[in-house]
Amino acid sequence: MDYTLTRIDPNGENDRYPLQKQEVVADPLDQQVHRTVYMGKLEHALHDMVNWGRKNSIWPYNFGLSCCYVEMVTSFTAVHDVARFGAEVLRASPRQADLMVVAGTCFTKMAPVIQRLYEQMLEPKWVISMGACANSGGMYDIYSVVQGVDKFLPVDVYIPGCPPRPEAYMQALMLLQESIGKERRPLSWVVGDQGVYRANMQSERERKHGERIAVTNLRTPDEI
């Protein structure tokens, strides 16, 4: 099977993700509530119910690229028990999965394969970039390593670390669940562009900046 990587056109309308069109819009349900209160509230309840089921039944696609995958698999053991978050059903086929975790170093030769696997996943689908190598290439600032998977995939959650601990992966799942709960997707089957609404997620660094800057007494390494 031949794999091809979709090239980015710097002069194009959507130069970052050629396969998707992204724009900043208001929450469509807020507009619906002002038009018809009853139908707006009903649609809001239906979205909440569907999103509740989606965020508590995430099916990850089982594949890994490097050492970060070992930490990801560790979270599936009884010690961490990722089943508490409804994400223990690993799928061997991208057509049965809705979460892709890019765990490890993404080489240039592997990028078209990852992109093809992402295209085979059905909506709704999400992407987690796990580890420094997947986020920005890590220490491999060379021609053969992609400097961040967000160069060719839309990433929902980034996990820092080299490699991140299983607890970091579980926190990323919780952040993804929070984001899924705020999504607005068509409640019926749609062919073509689904017009998905996703709320902006504030980075943890910005969200916890005030709390961290207020700390005056730092813990010793033995207390961490």
Curated annotation (Swiss-Prot):
GO cellular component: plasma membrane; respiratory chain complex I
Listed GO MF terms: 4 iron, 4 sulfur cluster binding; iron ion binding; NADH dehydrogenase (ubiquinone) activity; NADH:ubiquinone reductase (non-electrogenic) activity; quinone binding
EC number: 7.1.1.-
Bilayer topology: Peripheral membrane protein
Enzyme class: translocase
Entry keyword annotation includes Cell division: no
GO biological process: aerobic respiration; electron transport coupled proton transport
Pfam families: Oxidored_q6
Subcellular location: Cell inner membrane
Subunit field text: NDH-1 is composed of 13 different subunits. Subunits NuoB, CD, E, F, and G constitute the peripheral sector of the complex.
Family statement drawn from the similarity comment of this UniProt entry: Belongs to the complex I 20 kDa subunit family.
Biological role: NDH-1 shuttles electrons from NADH, via FMN and iron-sulfur (Fe-S) centers, to quinones in the respiratory chain. The immediate electron acceptor for the enzyme in this species is believed to be ubiquinone. Couples the redox reaction to proton translocation (for every two electrons transferred, four hydrogen ions are translocated across the cytoplasmic membrane), and thus conserves the redox energy in a proton gradient.
Protein's name in the database: NADH-quinone oxidoreductase subunit B
The gene coding this protein: nuoB
